[in-house]
């Protein structure tokens, strides 16, 4: 039987000093025989997705103690990408993922914790904690803060979210009063932004990986039903500890659950629901921590066979996360995939013996369990609040229409090709990614003239100054993990293209990345990035670029000889932006850039540079 890790600091005469300190935290004699379970919280008043988490760690802690464990809570940082966007703050967003992963590792290993409950929610927090959990490989369960309710206003016939406020603000024809109304209405409650953006995508993917409870990704932050997820997580983590430490059952460990097939399941879910392209970055990073050989080629392979079964904002205005929940949540999408013969259903989860068993219990089209049906009727109250579990509104009916509803069957898919695609070509030899769910059919094949910008800032200025015309392909480079550094999100450029009426008339290619709120022909993660000698750094104004999503290709239409000559010239100049960029790159960011790999590797640290240290 494996010993509790915590015995290192709780047992033996020589640990009298450590026990004295443990006692000072409130532990008693009997507690030194129990598992010490770390609660990694991410409460902060900076982020609406985390503003309600302050007391939830202690809610879980009390449940852990009732179930026979010892709970010890700590906090990680959390960056709000929406607030950090559009200025140098965005340089810190992706690097914060590594900081969060390291912080969880530091706290758990320094104090010899036996297991972890990860309370996450927004963009880089769930991925960072996931990386740490797979790195540590001790019992873990994820429970997130939940999605925000969609905004409501009389000025729009559909629900609102953050992107609506950004787009309307850039529309010169919109009155100040309309902009103010959208601003006040777009983000009405606590929780992660209400569309299928990065935060919600990742919280849904933890369900598919088998590391979170059903409903984790879709139950509203404001709804009273979400409290049960936190309480159940507290009980479940103690049970996982008993199975591993008491019964030598290694099948409950995160690397046993989140194996190669589980990563395929998660990616198939992502493709089926048209999730954020950032999820590709984060799944690749998590796979490396799990020592799972899952890469961009696997994602490309899956993207060709998985249909799109769900459309949510920003890909369609009609649906938000509250509508996904009403349609049965993630296990209903997984159920559709399973019935289509696509899903691996023999895998265990933290809550069920197999994914097949979980689908039978939680897919609303497969169960008559009234409690499950009631759970998925949880809906929005439409009352602005920053308080968790503050309302108990329910829909009168479920959306179980798999032909025309929010979630579809394979036979009635929105499209037979999924919502994400990987493109390859001479401009991105190691690949780039596009959220096809947000691309209009008329521009799936697009040839245009390159319009070069050496930074997101200059691109924003150029778009707002009407320098970008219909038929252009906006190239934003030196914004990758090294070149930024930090791989900024490009939500402002894409939002401004929409506001200028160019959403279906232009494309955008970058070695940076996109917010989950991005739609349109927006292609990111070009690898290798410009700062690493990628061909995106060789494109010149006016060059023809051909994008062919059906054939998964993207090519700069110049000869190989010309590209080779340009590379020789660029090697002499150095792979740096042609313009001076007035951004402050601190020591912390320089340290991140030094080890960062390109996006096709998940923008993780280059471990080869650390070998031998």
Swiss-Prot record:
Essential cofactor(s): [2Fe-2S] cluster; Mg(2+)
Enzyme Commission number: 4.2.1.9
UniProt: Mg(2+) binding residues: 81, 123-124, 489
GO terms under biological process: isoleucine biosynthetic process; L-valine biosynthetic process
Catalytic activity, reaction form: (2R)-2,3-dihydroxy-3-methylbutanoate = 3-methyl-2-oxobutanoate + H2O; (2R,3R)-2,3-dihydroxy-3-methylpentanoate = (S)-3-methyl-2-oxopentanoate + H2O
Residues bearing PTM N6-carboxylysine: 124
Top-level taxon in the UniProt lineage: Bacteria
Pfam families noted in UniProt: ILV_EDD_C (PF24877), ILVD_EDD_N (PF00920)
A Gene Ontology molecular function term of the record: magnesium ion binding
Pathway(s) the chain acts in: Amino-acid biosynthesis; L-isoleucine biosynthesis; L-isoleucine from 2-oxobutanoate: step 3/4; Amino-acid biosynthesis; L-valine biosynthesis; L-valine from pyruvate: step 3/4
Entry-linked InterPro entries: Dihydro-acid_dehy_C (IPR042096), DihydroxyA_deHydtase (IPR004404), DiOHA_6PGluconate_deHydtase_CS (IPR020558), ILV_EDD_C (IPR056740), ILV_EDD_N (IPR000581), IlvD/EDD_N (IPR037237)
Cofactor binding: number and manner: Binds 1 [2Fe-2S] cluster per subunit. This cluster acts as a Lewis acid cofactor.
Keyword presence, Lyase: yes
Keywords: 2Fe-2S, Amino-acid biosynthesis, Branched-chain amino acid biosynthesis, Iron, Iron-sulfur, Lyase, Magnesium, Metal-binding
Positions of [2Fe-2S] cluster binding: 122, 193
Catalytic site positions: 515 (proton acceptor)
Purpose: Functions in the biosynthesis of branched-chain amino acids. Catalyzes the dehydration of (2R,3R)-2,3-dihydroxy-3-methylpentanoate (2,3-dihydroxy-3-methylvalerate) into 2-oxo-3-methylpentanoate (2-oxo-3-methylvalerate) and of (2R)-2,3-dihydroxy-3-methylbutanoate (2,3-dihydroxyisovalerate) into 2-oxo-3-methylbutanoate (2-oxoisovalerate), the penultimate precursor to L-isoleucine and L-valine, respectively.
Subunit annotation: Homodimer.
Family that this chain belongs to: Belongs to the IlvD/Edd family.
Full protein name: Dihydroxy-acid dehydratase
Originating organism: Pseudomonas entomophila (strain L48)
Gene encoding the protein: ilvD
